[in-house]
Every structure is written in structure tokens, then in C-alpha cells.
Curated annotation (Swiss-Prot):
Active site, UniProt feature: C247
EC number, as in UniProt: 2.1.1.178
Source superkingdom: Bacteria
GO biological process, one term: rRNA base methylation
Localization (cell): Cytoplasm
PANTHER family: 28S RRNA (CYTOSINE(4447)-C(5))-METHYLTRANSFERASE-RELATED, NOP2 YEAST -RELATED NOL1/NOP2/FMU SUN DOMAIN-CONTAINING
Protein name (database record): Ribosomal RNA small subunit methyltransferase F
Main localisation: cytoplasm
Protein's job: Specifically methylates the cytosine at position 1407 (m5C1407) of 16S rRNA.
Annotated residues for binding of S-adenosyl-L-methionine: A125, A126, A127, P128, G129, S130, K131, E149, D176, D194
Reaction(s) catalysed (UniProt annotation): cytidine(1407) in 16S rRNA + S-adenosyl-L-methionine = 5-methylcytidine(1407) in 16S rRNA + S-adenosyl-L-homocysteine + H(+)
Length: 479
């Protein structure tokens, strides 16, 4: 694999020499940083099992090497990457996998370690959504996830990835993560804080990542991280699990932040060792039980993961002074709820008791029941999934609901050919050789729902959202 020139400040190299255990070679560290990063994917088990995914993609000649800490994770090598980007393959467009760096699969593995089954989880810094979607898959779309993102421009990307992966148990918020300790005290069974950091671990992906690096900047970032972990710890219920992670390598932003929390709340913080998280984890284990992953250890990005338990309640923060405002939705019950449920079922859309119907004007939504207790305490950007818009003749089912809820084996399902599916993703109407008998058609490809269509004569009218329409080379090259 080709080398690429990485910029290293002298002070950074000095710091790394001091931070690196004597069991590791500094020359190996430098060599690993100069190698381009191996690409990796995570199979979305909400859509397909790992076994079925491997069978489906076997004809493509992809080389898939298992990621040791994530059963659904694989490093991937392909011969046709230049002619067909991984993100344009049929399997990616239909949400069967997520392009995710192997190291970033570690925090969620830690969150669910030792049989942990949290019902209500917060992802404090969620965009672009790799870990939120991984959490949702581990929860099998049950319970609820509050996915927060401070950057307004990244909230849209977060929602797009959640929607593509068929996730229904997420509520989105757009706040500075430091507000949650006061706004939602002792609310969550588990919290992931993948903290904003100096990004020292990503030089294999971005050789210029350290151009603006300085010790002073790292200390400023660490101060923010302490405020974030303090807020997250307040929002965690006693007995709950907090995973703290970064994609950086210095101790100030990693071990020191966790040790500061333990010094601040000595009776309430317990470090949960991660040495048994996966075979070989002990190679990255610190004295405190954290994983400090230098890039040469597993040939991946540099990363840090710590797992903590809150063993006791701590004094609450002052209640926030803001007003959330009137909640614009009302629960949908009785005959109305029965009517839309029956209509949805008839169109191939189904959901369980963990999702509840809510209404705003002509919009009908499904909210995760586990999040309803938070309504009125915090303002949501988006809650659950939009199911439908009602109109005089019935309901207009929404694309995100189809992707999350549709049964691909329903009587109205119609399987497209490779060429027809490519036309669909380009936003064009489809003219199948044999038209379906139903007027409202659940369009599938590889037996995965990819949208709804109206049959008009021999034509299937495309309803694929305009903002998702693709051009350039698509996946017919996989034939």
C-alpha cells in the first residue's frame, strides 16, 4: 500500500514518545501513520444478517476481513473502487451496510459489553451517524436513542444516514452537549460521549490533520471535554454506563479527562476494564482499564475508549431557566389510530408496540415510546419517523417510513431488476416487462424495500425523494 507524507509537529512527536508504552515501537507508529487507512464497513443487521450479506456480496469479489471487536464489521478491499464508489453500490443505497472506520466501532462494542441492555441511550455528539446507527442495530430498533448534534450543518447528514438505515427509534436534538446534565438529569441508562477532539488519530485519512496542532489547543479542547463528560455524567442514571471516546492520542484529552471525573465524584465513578472486550484487547489496555489504541496495534485509526459506571447519585445541577415551548404534536388514539394502522398494514407497513402514533395537523408520526417521558423537558429537532400525510383520499406514506417499516414479502411488493433499480435511484419512472397488478406498489430490490410507486398503466411512477436521486455510475457494474 502506498505511503503518504504526514505532517508531524516536533512537539507532537515528543508527546507521543512519552505517551506510548515501552512495549510498542515508535518506528512502527510512524510507519503506520504513513500508510493509508484500510477501508471498513459495518453490516446493518436491521436489514440483513451478516451471513446473508456475505452470500449476497460473494459474487462481487470483495475481500472482507473481520474486525475483531465488531461481529458485523469488516475491512474491505475491492478492485473496482475507482469505477464504482462503495457509496454507489446497491447494498449501500438500500442501507445494508454503513461505511465506518473500524476504530469507531469500538465505543458501541464497549457500551453493550458484558450483556448490557440499555433501553434509553444518548449519543451526545452523533453526526454523521455511524455510532447512532450501530447502537440502533444493537437495540434492534427497540427502546430509544437521543442523538444530539451541536453542528447545524451536520444534523441533516445525521438524519439522512438514520433514514437510509431504516432506523425508527431515534429522536434528534441540536444543542451544545453541555446542557443535558441540567436539562435531563439521571435520565439515560447509557450514554456515549464520542467527544470533539484534536483528531491526532486520523492522520492516515488526512495527512494534514495536524497542521494546526498545538499543546495549548489540546488543553483548551480538554477543558471542553471535561465540561461535556460532567454534563453527560449528570444525565446518566445511577447504575448506568458511560462510554467516553476520542479519535486522538494524547493523555490530556483521554485518560486525564476520565481521571478528572473520578476525582470530582470519587464515590460515584467506577472504571470498568475493557481488557476482555475482544481477543487481543489487552494489547491496547492502560493501567486504568481503558483502551488507548495506537494505529500500529490493529492497523487502524488511533482511538481511545473508556467505560465507566455511575455507582451513586450526585448533587443535581441548577434547573435550566429556558422554556421548551408548546409541543405541537398530540397522541393519535381510538378510531383514527385504528384506521391509519389498518391502512398502513394494507400497504405493507408494520410496527410494534414500541412506536406510538402522534399527529400534527395532517402529518402522522411514529414516536419511540421510551422517549415520550422527555417531551416537555427538551426541544427536539425531529422525533421518530414521519409515517404519512393525510389527504382527502387517504394517506401519502413517507419514504423514511417505507425504508424502516415495509415488509418486503408483502403482497404489494414488486421486485425490480438490476437495470430497473438503477433507473429508480436515478429518479426515473420504471417500465417493467410485466406490470404489477396492484395500483400502490412497494418497490423492492434484492428483496429490500427501496420506495413506493403508483402504477399508471404499464409505468411505475417514481416517488424517490429528489434530494436522494443519484447520477454518475451506479451499481449495474456489480452484475
Amino acid at each position: 500500500m502506498a505511503q503518504h507524507a504526514v505532517y508531524f509537529p516536533d512537539a507532537f512527536l515528543t508527546q507521543m514518545r512519552e505517551a506510548m508504552p515501552s512495549t510498542l515501537s515508535f518506528d512502527d507508529f510512524l510507519a503506520a501513520c504513513q500508510r493509508p487507512l484500510r477501508r471498513s464497513i459495518r453490516v446493518n443487521t436491521l436489514k440483513i444478517s451478516v451471513t446473508d450479506f456475505l452470500a449476497l456480496t460473494a459474487p462481487y469479489g470483495w475481500s472482507l476481513t473481520p474486525v475483531p471487536w465488531c461481529e458485523e464489521g469488516f475491512w474491505i478491499e475491492r478492485d473496482d473502487e475507482e469505477s464504482l464508489p462503495l457509496g454507489s453500490t446497491a447494498e449501500h443505497l438500500s442501507g445494508l451496510f454503513y461505511i465506518q472506520e473500524a476504530s469507531s466501532m469500538l465505543p458501541v462494542a464497549a457500551l453493550f459489553a458484558e450483556g448490557n441492555t440499555p433501553e434509553r441511550i444518548m449519543d451526545v455528539a452523533a453526526a454523521p451517524g455511524s455510532k447512532t446507527t450501530q447502537i440502533a442495530a444493537r437495540m434492534n430498533n427497540q427502546g430509544a436513542i437521543l442523538a444530539n448534534e451541536f453542528s447545524a450543518s451536520r444534523v441533516k447528514v445525521l438524519h439522512a444516514n438514520i433514514s437510509r438505515c431504516g432506523i425508527s427509534n431515534v429522536a434528534l436534538t441540536h444543542f451544545d452537549g453541555r446542557v443535558f446534565g441540567a436539562a435531563l438529569p439521571e435520565t439515560f441508562d447509557a450514554i456515549l460521549l464520542d467527544a470533539p477532539c484534536s483528531g491526532e488519530g486520523v492522520v492516515r485519512k488526512d495527512p494534514d490533520a495536524l497542521k494546526n496542532w498545538s499543546v495549548e489547543s489540546n488543553l483548551d479542547i480538554a477543558a471542553t471535554q471535561r465540561e461535556l463528560i460532567d454534563s453527560a455524567f449528570h444525565a446518566l442514571r445511577p447504575g448506568g454506563t458511560l462510554v467516553y471516546s476520542t479519535c486522538t492520542l494524547n493523555r490530556e484529552e483521554n485518560e486525564s479527562v476520565c481521571l478528572w471525573l473520578k476525582e470530582t465524584y470519587p464515590e460515584a465513578v467506577e472504571f470498568l476494564p475493557l481488557g476482555d472486550l475482544f481477543p487481543g484487547a489487552e494489547r491496547a489496555l492502560t493501567a486504568e482499564g481503558f483502551l488507548h489504541v495506537f494505529p500500529q496495534i490493529y492497523d487502524c485509526e488511533g482511538f481511545f475508549v473508556a467505560r465507566l459506571r455511575k455507582t451513586a447519585a450526585i448533587p443535581p445541577l441548577p434547573a435550566p431557566g429556558y422554556k421548551v415551548g408548546k409541543f405541537p404534536f398530540a397522541p393519535m388514539k381510538g378510531r383514527e389510530a385504528t384506521q391509519i394502522t389498518q391502512a398502513a398494514n394494507a400497504s405493507g407497513l408494520q410496527w410494534g408496540e414500541n412506536l406510538h402514533l402522534w399527529q400534527r395537523d395532517k402529518e402522522v408520526w411514529l414516536f419511540p415510546a421510551e422517549i415520550e417521558a422527555l417531551i416537555g423537558k427538551v426541544r427536539f429537532s425531529r422525533l421518530g419517523i414521519k409515517l404519512a400525510e393525510s389527504h382527502n383520499k387517504g394517506y401519502r406514506w413517507q419514504h423514511e417510513a417505507v425504508i424502516a417499516l415495509a415488509d418486503p414479502h408483502h403482497a404489494n411488493a414488486f421486485e425490480l431488476s438490476h437495470q430497473e433499480a438503477e433507473e429508480w435511484y436515478r429518479g426515473r419512472d420504471v417500465y417493467p416487462q410485466t406490470a404489477p397488478s396492484a395500483d400502490d406498489v412497494l418497490v423492492t430490490f434484492q428483496h429490500q424495500p427501496i420506495g413506493l410507486a403508483k402504477r399508471i398503466g404499464s409505468r411505475l411512477k417514481n416517488s424517490y425523494p429528489r434530494e436522494l436521486v443519484r447520477d454518475g455510475k451506479l451499481f449495474t457494474g456489480n452484475d
